Amino acid sequence: MAATEPSGNPPAFERGGVLDMIERIGNKLPEPAILFAILAAIVVFFSAFGAWMGWQVQPVKLSYEMVPQVDASGQGVMGADGKALLVPKVGADGEKIRMLEPMGQPLKPRSLLTGEGIYWMFSSMLRNFTSMPALGLIFVAMLGIGLAEKFGFFGALMRALALATPKSILTPVIVLIGANSSVASDAGYIILPPLAAALYLAVGRHPIAGLAAAFAGVAGGFGGGFFPTGGDGVLAGFAQDAARVIDQTYSVGILHNLYFKAGSAIVVMLAGWLVTDWIVEPRLNRGKAAELAGVGGAGGASDEAAVIQSMALTAMEKKGLTYALATNVVVLGMFGLLILVPGAPLNGIGAPTLANGRVVAQQPVVISPGSAIATTPAEKILFKSEPVMNAAGEVTDPGLVVAMTGAKPTLLESPGDRWSHVIVPIIFLAFLVPGMAYGVVTGTLRSQKDFIEGLYHGIRSIVPVLAIAFFMAQFVNYFAYSGLDRMLAYAGGSLLVQADIPIPLLLVAFVFLVVLGDFAISGMLSKFGVLAPIFIPMFMMVGKSPELTTAAYRIGDSVVNIITPLNSYLLIILAVLQRYKKDAGLGSLISLMLPYSVVFFLIWTGFLLVWYYSGWPLGPDAPLHYGPKVG
């Protein structure tokens, strides 16, 4: 059964209800691209207004209150130099007691309405867009993912897993498949909910419960999953940009939340299982006879059997899936050898290099006044300069360090594990090769034209993202050029430190803020583009890593996906719902999914706090804490 558009006009919300109000307000909000254009204009205004008013903020650095280290007997521990060793003092809540020390000269906003500012806005427009870290990443990743989706690999894999699942564990498996379907673009929304509904009815369970479980997994579990996705790269890129407002050397990898995502997938599976079997399905069963009257004749069994039969894999599809999975194992195995074998190309530490052989640097370059750095033969970017200072704000070098007149430095990645610099090519090939294998075996890939069309399919899916990203890039870079990003980060971070709000409360409050934002701004990328430049630096000021802030964001972004009227996939799910409940409207769908949203919020946020107190890293090289290194 293909779910496309609802037949006829679906019933509206009950007039005057809260959901109707949310829908009306959401419909009046500007589209994400327009929203970022408006935000960019607001930054321009406040950059000029702040400069005129003489705003200034004192930069600070995070430090800890230090106390002498003592041994088990209570005696002070001495260092090799004979001096007492100091360690951070820990408060009653188990957190290190934070302090903020002044650093350097006060920051002042730089107006974008001066001659230099206006010139910069026009001259940097293209560079702002093309220098977005996430742009190339999501573009390349979606080439492989889109091709695999176009030739049917993802659809066949989900159908095979769902149809092979025993009745006793049908709910958790459906939810878990949904939570991992974000890697397959929108295939999870289109394939899994109608298939789950048919499977539930075929085994004598309420089909709407199957629909709800699948939708909860796909939408509500969007932030979880066992596999890296293009969306992870988008979040990493924006998190890194935001982090470098405070720390120019900070890097966020695409796998920054991998461990937490994997754990979250299990949590979402268990929570979805609980809600479906204990709350949603018992409620549905009370009105099952009336709702299903006339569906598929004889209780719907014959029609649903036909649906399941139509979704069963053909012999050719089974063969294609076997070959695709085998090639996936080969690709990942080859990369595993390249990473693990000593002396192999991806083994050890390294840094990216440019085409002309120069090593890509991250640390600022010390230059003399008036110097310029050539980025390409056709372009030279002039930089303003400032003294080289240490963390205490003292001048340590008579030379001058590069300081961008634009938004953010063009200096790229720091040295690290070689494999960490090739995550995107690994994702690209891990989906491209199996997708091609499946297409060749099943006959969906027959020619070069088919291959190119498969690549086009992935690019088409991100065209809206590119449009949003252009205006988002202007907003983010205007914010940075004006200096308002650093001023807001230092001011907000200082307030948080002075308020001494418990970190768990801060995390819960941030998750709730993202939940509220989901009713105003649709899309993971759009909301993160607004929130990351503000909250990631502020949380760093209280000693929490960008990776932790991103993990909290994933929860808030996911749990409301299943009930926000701004989710464009609601109409697809509604079409399936109306098959079993003729008078269903969006209000019916949202009331059906509300228990999932509430329970996911409570359990998933609790899981984040458990993870935080356990001290586990969120992913490879992804700590929970940020701060000065102390002994």
Where are the language model's segments positioned?
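Membrane-core helix-loop-helix motifs of multi-pass transport proteins
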Residues: 23-27, 193-288, 314-322, 552-554, ...
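Short amphipathic alpha-helical coupling elements at transmembrane boundaries
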Residues: 20-27, 127, 156-163, 197-202, ...
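Hydrophobic transmembrane alpha-helices of multi-pass small-molecule transporters
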Residues: 1-143, 148-150, 257-471, 595-601, ...
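Extracellular/periplasmic helix-exit of transmembrane alpha-helices
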Residues: 228-235, 347-348, 470-489, 611-619
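Hydrophobic alpha-helical transmembrane segments of multi-pass integral membrane proteins
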Residues: 137-142, 166-197, 466-472, 498-537, ...
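Helix-loop-helix module between adjacent transmembrane segments
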Residues: 140-150, 168, 174-187, 217-225, ...
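Helix-loop-helix junctions that connect adjacent transmembrane helices in secondary transporters/permeases
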Residues: 480-505
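Loop-to-transmembrane-helix entry motif
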Residues: 25-33, 125-132, 161-168, 180-183, ...
